[in-house]
Amino acid sequence: MQKILSLLLLLCAFSAFGQGRLQLQVEDTQQLPLAGAVVHFMGKHYLTDSDGKVTIEKTPKGSYPIKITYLGYHDYEATLTLPIAQPYKIVMKETVNQLDAVTVVGHNPYVIECRLPYKVQVIDGFLKHSGDELSKILTQIAGVSMIQTGGTIAKPVIHGLHGNRILILNNEVRQEGQQWGADHAPEIDPMVADQISVVKGAEAVRYGSDALGGVILISPNKLPYGDGLHGKLLPSFASNGRKTTLTASVEGSVPKLHSWAWRMQGTLKRSGDLSTANYLLNNTAAREANFSVATGVQKNKGTAEVFYSRYENESSVFYGSHIGNLDDLLGRFEIGRPLTTYPFSYSINAPKQKVVHHLLKAKAFYLLPLGSKLTAQYAFQKDIRQEFSLRRMDRTRIPALNMELTTHTLDVDWDHSYRYRWGTMIGGSFSKQDNYNQPGTGVVPVIPNFASLSYGVFGIQRYSYMNWQAQAGLRYDYKYLNADGYDMYSQRYGGEHQFHNLTYSVGASHHLSSWIDVGSYIGLAWRAPHVNELYSSGLHHGAGTYDLGDETLQSETGLKWLTSFTFNNRKIRVNIDMYLQWIQNYIYDYPTGETRTLFSGVYPIFQYAQADAFFRGVDLDAKLPLLKWHSLSDQELNYELKGSVVFANEMQTKRYFPFIPAPRINQQLKWNVERNRGLVRNFAVGIGHTFVAQQTRFEPAQELVPTTPDAYHLFEANIETKLKIGGQQTLGIRLSAENLLNTEYKEYTNRFRYYAHDLGRNVFVRLIYNF
């Protein structure tokens, strides 16, 4: 018996010897501690203390993945081999208003960091805007606005450019839907993202064609390798339209297989008729159901991941935009509002549209010797769009437009970081696309069937030394397009087109001091005319317009020069972006002043044309602390200011282009209280004011009405708190109101401003539950 006890004691001693203690020190690049950073390690969560430290007991020997997250900072991910020198220091890099970083992940001593010389601006705390559409969320960034078709459909605008000139990367995949229409909102659930950011430069070299205005990055969080089960629940309610939204996500790693992780996410939305300050907008209800799943395996030398998402939206189109005869149409333009309204309803009736978008992505990367990384990614997308119009008898239930767009893309790139200062990326992409108009609609499609093939190759060289970062790149693209259809007279039309272009970019940034950064970037981007611009000939049901294309249109090429100045001393933050952009063969549509009469009504004719264009403007984003004090909690009062101005006109005639955003200013006054203990961890109150000037730079001959909407002021307010309700569970509560004074106004870039006013007061209640 005594021998057995001795043996057990000996085994216990060896077991205790095999387990150690891990001490971590988490700080920022200024060597300041980050309190409250979340450490994910071996399936559990830990929080750093006020000194940025955390101690994890009973850590056995071996290699384990670790992940650290902190609001406003890039996630830190690595693999720790224990035992390790302690305390182990971890440096977090800030994301908000900082230069983007391209880092090769791994443990190779030759890997260096290269910061790119253009701005990637990140939306801070976008989950507080759950339930909003992507375009509206993006307007939090200076220089980004939206072009609307009524109150339910919106597209983002960057520096005056929108549609096919804005490239959206949905989880690193080029979003390929029917984005050519002003009434075709991006088929993306923004709640799939952990971070939404905007690149304002003409990023054609890295991402390919269509990025003249900029790039929108929809980035989900990295899969939680080595983490335990956790998730979040985000219910919300909006008074305008009585809109309810519910988003839920859950994620984790497979027990005992920490290198295998997964995530599931879904969103449900339902809203009824929206309202202006004084009347309802009938037939503006919408429904949405989305979900996504992701899984992946992470090893020391590489990672393989699969992602799938399904987006479904059904939304009605305002009755008042479809008018029966010419006299009524002209009268509506003069009155500017519907003559008759009906009681509130959740019903979705024709005219309406229904969209289903599938996205499947498979990606893998492998870490090569000496700091290289090889990445391959394949993506499949299918976009199904149906638009319903008012028709005779029971034909209203048959879609008047029924299109299926199928896209296959393949991207391969090799990224290498040298030991001293240099980095290189070389890659290529291939895309195959087919658009098919389903027969049986009884209506001539607004665009013909088409097929396209495109490929591109690029090279980017980076340089980083001391306080200097620089980058230069070159890319070649080729696109083949074959369109084939029948017009309303049963005459076949279409043809083959080939486009190719060489694009380049060069830029540099300099860290003048610990407070000041200056960067300048110039890039040439291009895009081929889309099929709708070449061959449109029919009623665009969702927009309520009769569109006419021009098959002689040429490719657009745009040269953009962007210069940024940033001052940030951790108290005062000022960022100024100034840009000039020359676009050759700029394509735009404008109202001709004529109308076309169909069975369903009378519609204004919009014609596509092109001219050389000159865009220029300034964006301002500033934050000024007014008061700051410490007692039982950290309290501060801040003033924030955002503004943007963009001008655009033809180079030769100096005429103005339609639908260019008017100058705007947004200012916020925010009081924030932070606590590290107790039930209430955060409390904040804010008030805001937005001013939009009247757009005076327009051509009356290219407008349906001879004047533009008056300038307007909107006010908003919000109050929020964050509760610690046990363990790692938190509950955020946010109450906010937009258009607080219920102002009646019209937005120049809303294509339905001819028929009705914009939205009235809207009160939101949002919850964010993390578990």
Locate predicted features:
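Short acidic/polar hinge/loop motifs at secondary-structure boundaries
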Residues: 57, 127, 173-201
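Outer membrane beta-barrel strand-and-loop segments of large Gram-negative receptors
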Residues: 397-413, 456, 548-554, 560, ...
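Gram-negative outer-membrane beta-barrel transporters
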Residues: 579-583, 601-695
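Outer-membrane beta-barrel translocator/receptor signature
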Residues: 192-194, 205-277, 284-291, 299-302
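Flexible loop and strand-edge segments within Gram-negative outer membrane beta-barrel domains
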Residues: 271, 282-284, 288, 302-367, ...
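Short, acidic, small-residue-rich periplasmic hinge/interaction motif at the N-terminus
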Residues: 27, 69-73, 83-127, 163
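C-terminal beta-signal and adjacent terminal beta-strands/loops
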Residues: 526, 583-585, 589, 637, ...
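N-terminal periplasmic accessory domains that precede
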Residues: 87-91, 125, 134-138, 154-157, ...
